[in-house]
A protein has these predicted regions:
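C-terminal segment of N-terminal export signals and the immediately downstream linker at the start
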Residues: 1, 21-53
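N-terminal export signals
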Residues: 5-27
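Beta-propeller-forming repeat regions
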Residues: 46-100, 108, 112, 197-206, ...
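Carbohydrate-binding surfaces in secreted/extracellular proteins
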Residues: 59, 145, 208-234
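Secretory/extracellular carbohydrate-interaction modules
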Residues: 119-187
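Beta-strand-rich interaction surfaces with strong enrichment in secreted/lumenal proteins
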Residues: 129-135, 200-205, 245
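Surface-exposed coil/turn segments at beta-strand junctions on protein surfaces, enriched
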Residues: 136-138, 151, 205-209, 218, ...
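Short, aromatic/His-centered strand-loop micro-motif at the edge of beta-sheets
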Residues: 189-213
């Protein structure tokens, strides 16, 4: 059976797509307190068979077994910056929003197929596994499903009016004795505790031996909830009035015979909204350059995941690619060590190779300590790396060793499988006042760091909650950098200016400092994606100005995503327990938009694709779930379905016209895309980017406005 027929069997669906509406602003009428009622038995006014079927599924199309591959055997963090196109059984038109959890299996009971959530939720106060379908345009529908709880310890129910995996309505049975209606709010007020607004509840005794038919009817703000034909709850709430649907459970539970229906006139309105949305996307995409292949080559045996560096290794004025393979040691990804380096041109010609390549060593879930940089200022690039407990400098053109020193002794308060530090990442700073950034910072995970000069002599060291990767901010006299790392800032001499380590309870995944307000006289701020702490903004004295708990904030970028607004905007993406949610902030950390365009992580790279001042954000190279987002979080550039790799992505100007190319690769191939049309204006946008010598899977990406005349 071909894949299209396989997906069609047992399922009818109307509409798929990314949601558009943001929750209403504070003070709006839609946010008023609901008029909640707990009701006894009443006859249903609508059956699941009435009206038009939006979707009906008995789950028979799925094969018996796990629906996702056991990603945690690989390490769920692989999806922080890698796109996995094959995550198990094809799910369409369903989706698993928590792509790092292998929560869903299918089998049969008494000859009838069922979908089962089989895990004991590891974070029940923070998230609930969801199996999702439908369209953001769906509204005024009835959703019905048969449910059999296999435990009474926690909730099982129906998700509806779904906007993101942190913003939806839930009708659930819980505790063996209660039926509950609630809305999950997108912003938490307490660390690692989901914010629920209760709408209505009623007593309902249930057990684990029977199936119960749950039904929710939506009509504008009106919500009615039924169990086995008896209406238990009714309320009015307009925070969200449309959205996707699904099932959810914090404990093992089974689901059968899922159906969504609506009146015929509602279906016509849904189709109209979807058609208008698609017409708008078609128009926007036609106005943007289309991606076309510029170059492609293979990496047989020596390819890797997102563990590469770009730089001019041989001095020819062109970028080359340095591909690193690695072998994790001791525990997960905490003590990774480099096994092979391969330098290649963008035509695929190997310049040099150091180590033994092996495709088993290509993927990673961490940073690796190597960079390309002219560390000695002689005009030629070197490769600076940690390997075999040695801090080394190699010739960029040949890979030959120029200089090395032993790594520092591992601090006594650290996890110490080795006497010497194995290294986590390398970043370059100007801490001497000499031309260029010639001092290097080397750190472990996540507590200690050392500053070396370009002769590999230790200048000073520090410790604290270092997070993943530091940021150099040039603000001192003579071009000296401040060291922004974790939730702290140091000056160039090693004095800690401020720290908020004790106030925040999860590490910083990405940090940046700058004045992004659009007012040249304004003071700079520090911004951080603080993992489960969310998105945080500090003033230059270290005081927390905004703390927005949007979930596990993983990566973010800063650029001109909204040309009509002053200053720059910050775009962040979530991962752990809230994956795929993208939030756009202004420079004051106010939320401008929030959507869930994909269900896994992304480096979320800023792309100067048009050259006219509008910056896009790259999700991934995947044909269906990837592409580029604009400042309204619309997918305005997509990639052709031409068989290209989509595991990893990077952005760089490699053709020389100031616009960015998109580099896509996996462990076997590299494809480079450029625009399908030349740039024809008198000046071109050429934003200043993070230097290539400070590359990381955990760096905040900056596209600072700058123009070039033509």
């Amino acid at each position: 059976m071909d894949r299209r027929n396989f997906l069609r069997k047992g399922t009818m669906v109307a509409g798929l797509g990314a949601s558009k509406a943001l929750w209403p602003p504070p003070g709006s009428a839609a946010r008023s307190r609901p008029d909640s009622l707990s009701l006894g038995a009443q006859a249903s006014s609508l059956t699941a068979s009435s009206g038009t079927v939006l979707l009906r599924d008995d789950f028979s199309k799925f094969p018996a077994g796990w629906l996702s591959s056991p990603l945690n055997q690989l390490n769920g963090a692989i999806q922080e910056v890698h796109y996995l196109s094959n995550r198990g059984v094809p799910l369409e038109p369903w989706a698993n929003p928590f792509a790092h959890l292998d929560a869903w299996v299918v089998s049969e009971e008494d000859g009838r197929p069922y979908l089962e959530q089989h895990l004991i939720n590891p974070k029940p106060t923070l998230m609930s596994p969801i199996f999702l379908t439908g369209d953001s345009a769906w509204s005024d529908y009835t959703v019905e499903v048969r449910v059999r709880p296999l435990s009474l310890a926690d909730l099982v129910g129906v998700v509806f009016r779904y906007h993101t995996n942190r913003h939806y309505y839930l009708f659930a049975l819980t505790g063996g004795h209660t039926a509950r209606l609630a809305v999950r709010r997108p912003i938490e007020t307490t660390f690692r505790v989901a914010d629920w607004r209760e709408l209505a509840a009623n007593e309902f005794a249930y057990d684990t031996q029977h199936y119960y038919t749950l039904r929710v009817e939506n009509e504008g703000p009106l919500i009615r909830a039924w169990v086995d034909g008896k209406k238990l709850l009714e309320t009015r709430d307009g925070e969200l009035t449309a959205g996707k649907v699904g099932v959810s459970a914090n404990i093992p539970a089974r689901f059968q015979d899922f159906a969504v229906t609506c009146p015929v006139d509602v279906k016509e309105k849904i189709d109209d909204r979807r058609d208008r949305r698609q017409s708008e996307l078609t128009r926007l995409r036609s106005e943007n350059p289309q991606p076309v292949v510029w170059k492609k080559f293979t990496t047989p045996g020596f390819g890797a995941g997102r563990n590469v560096r770009f730089g001019d290794l041989d001095g020819d004025g062109q970028l080359e690619m340095l591909i690193c393979q690695n072998i994790p040691r001791v525990h997960a990804d905490d003590f990774d060590q480099i096994s092979c380096l391969t330098a290649v041109t963008l035509d695929g010609r190997i310049l040099w190779q150091s180590g033994k390549p092996d495709p088993r060593n290509g993927l990673l879930t961490n940073d690796t300590p190597f960079q390309i940089h002219d560390i000695d200022g002689d005009g030629r690039s070197e490769v600076v790396l940690v390997r075999d407990f040695k801090l080394q400098i190699l010739e960029g053109a040949s890979g030959k060793l120029k200089r090395w020193v032993w790594m520092p002794s591992a601090p006594p308060d650290a996890v110490r499988p080795y006497e010497l530090v194995s290294g986590d990442c390398i970043a370059f700073f100007n801490l001497s006042g000499n031309p260029g950034r010639r001092e290097l910072l080397l750190k472990d995970r996540y507590a200690h760091f050392w500053i070396f000069n370009n002769r590999l002599e230790v200048l000073w060291r520090g410790q604290g909650q270092t997070g993943h990767f530091p940021y150099p901010y040039a603000s001192e006299p003579g071009g000296l950098d401040k060291v922004v790392m974790g939730y702290s800032v140091w000056d160039s001499s090693g004095h800690q200016l401020w720290s908020q380590d004790r106030a925040l309870h999860d590490h910083a995944d990405a940090v940046i400092m700058g004045n992004f307000s659009g007012d040249p006289a304004a003071a700079p701020h520090v911004y951080a994606c603080g993992s489960d702490e969310g998105f945080i903004m500090f003033d230059e004295r270290g005081e927390i100005q905004k703390h927005v708990r949007i979930g596990h904030a993983q990566n973010f970028s800063v650029g001109k995503y909204r040309p009509e607004l002053p200053g720059l905007q910050c775009m962040a993406i979530n991962f752990w327990y809230n994956p795929g949610i993208v939030t756009l902030f202004d420079a004051d950390a106010n939320i401008l938009a929030q959507e869930e365009p994909a269900h896994s992580g992304s480096p979320l790279l800023p792309v100067n694709w048009r050259g006219d001042g509008q910056v896009f954000a790259l999700l991934s190279g995947n044909v269906r779930e990837g592409g580029m987002l604009d400042g309204q979080l619309r997918r305005v550039v997509t990639f052709p379905d031409d068989g290209h790799p989509d595991l990893c992505c990077a952005v760089a100007d490699v053709t020389g016209d100031a616009r960015d190319e998109v580099i896509l690769w996996d462990q076997e191939r590299v494809w480079i895309y450029t625009q399908d049309r030349p740039f024809r204006d008198k000046r071109i946008y050429a934003p200043v980017r993070n230097p290539l010598y400070n590359e990381s899977n955990y760096r905040a990406m900056l596209a600072w406005p700058q123009w070039q005349g033509l």
